[in-house]
Every structure is written in C-alpha cells, then in structure tokens.
Amino acid sequence: MSALRITTASAARMLRTSNAMMPSVMGAAQRRALSDSAEPARVPSVESARVPEKLAKEDSPLATPKRNSPDYNVPIDKATSTWTPVPKHIQNGSEEGILPAAVVSGAPMELQARTVRIYLPSKPATQSSNSRVLWRMDWDVLEKGHRWENELMGWQSSGDFVQGTHLTFRTKEEAIQFAEKQGYEYFVQEPNQRHFTPKAYANNFLYSPKKLKIVRTK
C-alpha cells in the first residue's frame, strides 16, 4: 500500500513539472511565430539588381569604346573581292575638305586611278540650233590589254567597263564638283569658239585708198 502511494506521489509530481514547463515552451514557439510574421520579407531592390549588370558591362572585354575620331587601323577584308576590297580606313565625314565617295561607295578601285575629261561637245555641221549646251565627262582610253578588233569582220570590243560611257552636266562647275567628290583626276577642255566677221554686199562699193580688190568680202 505504501509503495502504491509513493508511485502515485511521483506521478503527480511529474505531471506538475510538465504542466509548469508547457507554457514556457508554448510561449517561445508563439513568440517565434509572431516575430517571423511581423518581420517583412526582404525583396531585392532594383538598384541592387542593376549594379551587377553595370559592372558586367564595364568589365566586359566586348564593350565597344566610344571614338570621337575615325579609326584608321581597320584591316582590309580581302575576302570581299580581289578587285574591290574594303578600304584601309573608313572616314565618317569629320575630316576637312571633300570626302571621296569612292572610299565607301563600293565602286571598283580601278576607277580611282582613271583620268576624266570635262568638255563641251562641238555642234555638228548638220545642226544649226544651240542644243549642245550640256557639258560632258568621259574616261580616258586604256592603252593595253583592254581592246581587241576582229581582223576579218572589223568588230571591236573592249574589257574596259567605262569605255563609251559618259555623263552630262548642266554646267562646268557641276562636272568639276562631281569629279572631286568621286576622287577622279580631271582636266577641263575649253570649247573653241568660232568668231564670224559680218559681211555685206555693200562693202564692195566703199571707198578704199589702197589698191582695189575684186572681192572685198573675203
């Protein structure tokens, strides 16, 4: 009977200690839950997210540097064409003077070494009007290797792609400006003006102190 009382007393003591510890444990759990719910979630800001991107752009070796002057060290791309490769330097218009259009136009490089003639065509004998007022520009004729002629039929041909090609301009100044813009060497051939002396039949009867002529209108 005494042993049963001791067991009951020990069980009651253990129950009291467990009930006393339960509020402290529950209080700590509740406080932790409340603190977690009260603390706002940390969201990364936009500025902090952009900083690595800026650093990556600055540290990237592929970033193109800003240039205020033309890059004269551009290599030639010979794979584009044997005759018309990419020029050694690309000018962006910041240079003084006239920029040759052949640098970036893609025209054959052979045209840059050609000489052009600027002239005013003469009026044919069968024409009496003044329609020949346009100035003409044509290229010089190559001497060797660009022309052949059939001895039997007399047919002629040439490997020069500008033979027989000419351009017309309204004034001589426009032709000169175009030649300078393209980078051509040019020379201007001024037209030969014919001076006519007015003649009249009445001049045969004018007084002349010198020896008389049969025909005075020559």
From Swiss-Prot:
<comment type="function">
    <text>Accessory subunit of the mitochondrial membrane respiratory chain NADH dehydrogenase (Complex I), that is believed not to be involved in catalysis. Complex I functions in the transfer of electrons from NADH to the respiratory chain. The immediate electron acceptor for the enzyme is believed to be ubiquinone.</text>
</comment>
<feature type="region of interest" description="Disordered">
    <location>
        <begin position="31"/>
        <end position="74"/>
    </location>
</feature>
<dbReference type="GO" id="GO:0022900">
    <property type="term" value="P:electron transport chain"/>
</dbReference>
<keyword id="KW-0809">Transit peptide</keyword>
<keyword id="KW-0679">Respiratory chain</keyword>
<dbReference type="GO" id="GO:0005743">
    <property type="term" value="C:mitochondrial inner membrane"/>
</dbReference>
<feature type="transit peptide" description="Mitochondrion">
    <location>
        <begin position="1"/>
        <end position="33"/>
    </location>
</feature>
<dbReference type="InterPro" id="IPR006885">
    <property type="entry name" value="NADH_UbQ_FeS_4_mit-like"/>
</dbReference>
<dbReference type="GO" id="GO:0045271">
    <property type="term" value="C:respiratory chain complex I"/>
</dbReference>
<keyword id="KW-0249">Electron transport</keyword>
<comment type="subunit">
    <text>Complex I is composed of about 40 different subunits. This is a component of the iron-sulfur (IP) fragment of the enzyme.</text>
</comment>
<keyword id="KW-0813">Transport</keyword>
<comment type="similarity">
    <text>Belongs to the complex I NDUFS4 subunit family.</text>
</comment>
<dbReference type="InterPro" id="IPR038532">
    <property type="entry name" value="NDUFS4-like_sf"/>
</dbReference>
<protein>
    <recommendedName>
        <fullName>NADH-ubiquinone oxidoreductase 21 kDa subunit, mitochondrial</fullName>
    </recommendedName>
</protein>
<keyword id="KW-0999">Mitochondrion inner membrane</keyword>
<keyword id="KW-0472">Membrane</keyword>
<keyword id="KW-0496">Mitochondrion</keyword>
<feature type="compositionally biased region" description="Basic and acidic residues">
    <location>
        <begin position="50"/>
        <end position="60"/>
    </location>
</feature>
<dbReference type="Pfam" id="PF04800">
    <property type="entry name" value="NDUS4"/>
</dbReference>
